[in-house]
Amino acid sequence: MAKTIIVKQVRSAARRPAVQTAVLKGLGLNKMHRTRELEDTPSIRGMVAKIPHLVEIIEERG
């Protein structure tokens, strides 16, 4: 079983640079307070690290 993380969007993407909006879209997040369970890979961790002010990691499983 692969390790997973649960990511929650805590701030809006409105009036943010296009790069940050694209990262949110890549994570599957598009509205505030939505959560996604994602595979814990270096690429996902890198995406989360680019927008720490917009998302938070709620839980790490595995």
UniProtKB/Swiss-Prot annotation:
Record-linked InterPro entries: Ribo_uL30_ferredoxin-like_sf, Ribosomal_uL30_bac-type, Ribosomal_uL30_ferredoxin-like
One GO CC annotation: cytosolic large ribosomal subunit
GO BP of this protein: translation
GO molecular function: structural constituent of ribosome
Highest taxon of source: Bacteria
Homology family: Belongs to the universal ribosomal protein uL30 family.
Description of how the protein assembles with itself and partners: Part of the 50S ribosomal subunit.
Protein name, UniProt field: Large ribosomal subunit protein uL30
Higher taxonomy: Bacteria, Pseudomonadati, Pseudomonadota, Alphaproteobacteria, Rhodobacterales
